Amino acid sequence: MAIERTLSIIKPDAVAKNVIGQIYSRFEGAGLKIVASRMAHLSRADAEKFYAVHAARPFFKDLVDFMISGPVMIQVLEGEGAILKNRDLMGATDPKKAEKGTIRADFADSIDANAVHGSDAAETAAVEIAFFFPEMNVYSR
């Protein structure tokens, strides 16, 4: 499997629960390296731009409101099959349907406050990484 990079966001609900370190441990335990990270409090404009693909969906306003409700932790993960590996670690979008031991099963409260975001494909990952790390201050190690 190829070395890939993927974008991960620890959402406001998980940041508020003080579980960033526990989530990072899961990434690293699965063989993923954190090659860039920063904490941010997204502006409405940034959240709307980042989630623009969902603009026509009925949940868009609530998603944006949630994502600007508190700080988020944004990171780039790197490793073999990083995109799929991260999605497996996250679990199903709805934490009630997520397998036991996944990030969402353990830390998420609802389908809206679901603890984490992860890129769903290589093309999406490239766009999402460039959105949050435009200077490409991402370092392989």
Curated annotation (Swiss-Prot):
GO cellular component, one term: cytoplasm
Biological-process GO terms, alphabetical: CTP biosynthetic process; GTP biosynthetic process; UTP biosynthetic process
Cofactor (UniProt): Mg(2+)
Superkingdom of this protein's organism: Bacteria
Predominant place of localization: cytoplasm
Binding-site list for ATP: 11, 59, 87, 93, 104, 114
EC id: 2.7.4.6
InterPro entries: NDK-like_dom, NDK-like_dom_sf, Nucleoside_diP_kinase
Molecular function in Gene Ontology: ATP binding; metal ion binding; nucleoside diphosphate kinase activity
Keywords in alphabetical order: ATP-binding, Cytoplasm, Kinase, Magnesium, Metal-binding, Nucleotide metabolism, Nucleotide-binding, Phosphoprotein, Transferase
Position of the signal peptide: none
A Pfam family recorded for this sequence: NDK
Record keyword Kinase present: yes
Catalytic activity as recorded in UniProt: a 2'-deoxyribonucleoside 5'-diphosphate + ATP = a 2'-deoxyribonucleoside 5'-triphosphate + ADP; a ribonucleoside 5'-diphosphate + ATP = a ribonucleoside 5'-triphosphate + ADP
Location(s) in or outside the cell: Cytoplasm
Active site: 117 (pros-phosphohistidine intermediate)
NCBIfam families: PRK00668.1
Protein role: Major role in the synthesis of nucleoside triphosphates other than ATP. The ATP gamma phosphate is transferred to the NDP beta phosphate via a ping-pong mechanism, using a phosphorylated active-site intermediate.
Subunit structure: Homotetramer.
Family as reported in the entry's similarity comment: Belongs to the NDK family.
Protein name: Nucleoside diphosphate kinase
Organism in which the protein naturally occurs: Burkholderia cenocepacia (strain HI2424)
